[in-house]
Design a protein with these regions (language model features):
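Patatin-like phospholipase
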Residues: 1-37, 45-402
Length: 402
């Protein structure tokens, strides 16, 4: 059976999505359309690029030369600031508005310049300046480099995989996979669904990068002119962040067949829809194996904990109405007690998360034998359900009034 798959966002917890898909593939099922947000966007990209569940598992459990999870490097130090960021950025302008009346002007301005430059060179102060100037405490440069490398690694249909430089239109032509990535345009105040229809000139790797850009954690992405328009609308210079800000689990986009939604998602396929949800309310059984040491240093602990708390709270606001309306289409993968940015996850904790996801998928498939469904539903829709999907999907995709 081919399923149209929706992958929820959840940061480091997203490895559970791979464990669940592993079971789906083992039981002979495959995918049609793919839709992902944040960590779900990463999973969708790898599937569309031809990675098997085993290959994805190997990639997502990689460790560096020091034995640390490669994902831990994704919270990288900010790259050096430009002279413009230091001399004319938001922080320097803020200082410029503070008048130190007891210091002569010819001394005050150079002093403020020196202070800003010192902050830009510091440790945590450098992260603070990155948050002010770039919208994120950490840099995602290492993630982007990693994703590019993986999109060019191995083979696809017997040929070297070479997807890293492709646009979304080129990627669709090369693979034939209808894949979409959710992001949020904070400048325009709207949800973006990035695919070969809506943003054909957008680079594949940046579509994924934008989808996973958790606000305040990673630096924002600014839409470039050479990425072309979004749905024929110029959004050059707009700030784009994680799609989970507006909807972390937009399953209704695959259920709805409203004309406005179809213009974004394309025509519905004769595949049942299946959403993989990371359920923070469902506890994960105790880890198997020996406990691993904590890799975060004490100096970083309070900052990391605060950011984790903020991010987990923000992205924990689930699309409850959608999940309740389409409960039969949702596989709830236990993720209770796991953090969105727990990229230093120990091997025993990771194994426990994967085991729980596999068990949840097996239980779902046993209870929901697959049935062909042109409606996108695994069974005939209850009265009003399709109308609800149309309403929710249209509301999500409609840009705000000027």
């Amino acid at each position: 059976m081919r399923y149209d798959l929706v992958f929820e966002g959840g940061g480091a917890k997203g490895i559970a999505l791979v464990g669940a898909y592993e079971v789906l593939a083992e039981q002979g099922h495959s995918f049609g359309r793919l839709l992902g947000t944040s960590a779900g966007a990463i999973t969708a990209a790898f599937l569309a690029a031809g990675y098997s569940s085993g290959e994805m598992m190997a990639v997502l459990t990689e460790r560096d030369a020091a034995g640390a999870p490669v994902f831990a490097s994704f919270m990288g130090e900010p790259p050096p600031f430009t002279a413009q960021e230091v001399g004319q950025g938001a922080f320097r302008r803020l200082l410029g508005g503070v008048d130190l009346t007891f210091i002569p002007g010819f001394v005050e301005d150079p002093l403020k310049d020196q202070l800003t430059a010192a902050i830009a060179r510091g440790g945590l102060t450098r992260n603070f300046l990155a948050l002010v100037e770039r919208g994120g405490w950490y840099s995602a440069h290492s993630f982007l480099a990693w994703l590019r490398a993986k999109m060019d690694a191995g083979t696809y249909n017997g040929q070297p995989r070479r997807f890293s430089a492709m646009t979304l239109a080129q990627f669709y032509t090369a693979t034939g996979v209808d894949v979409a990535f959710c992001a949020t345009d904070t400048t325009g105040g709207r949800q973006l669904v990035l695919n070969h229809r809506t943003a054909p000139a957008c680079p594949l790797v940046y579509a994924v990068r934008m989808s996973m850009s958790i606000p305040l954690l990673w630096d924002e992405v600014i839409w470039r002119q050479d990425w072309g328009p979004y749905q024929s609308r110029d959004i050059t210079g707009h700030t784009i962040v994680d799609g989970g800000v507006l909807s972390n689990f937009p399953l209704e986009l695959f259920v709805s067949d409203a004309p406005f939604v179809t213009a974004v998602m394309g025509p519905k396929q004769n595949n049942p829809v299946l959403g993989l949800l990371l359920d923070d309310a469902a506890p994960v059984p105790s880890p198997r194996g020996l406990l691993a040491r904590v890799t975060i240093t004490p100096g970083d602990l309070s900052t990391v904990q605060r950011l984790r708390g903020l991010v987990n709270t923000m992205l924990g606001a689930r699309d409850r109405q959608v999940m309740e309306a389409f409960a039969d289409l949702v596989v709830a993968l236990p993720a209770g007690g796991y953090g969105t940015v727990e990229f230093d996850m120990s091997e025993p904790r990771r194994n426990a998360l994967l085991d729980a996801a596999r068990a949840a998928m097996r239980a779902y498939l046993a209870a929901h034998p697959p049935l062909p469904a042109a409606s996108g539903l695994a069974a005939p829709a209850a009265p009003g359900v399709k109308n609800l999907a149309d309403t929710l999907a249209t509301r999500l995709l409609t840009p705000p009034a000027p």
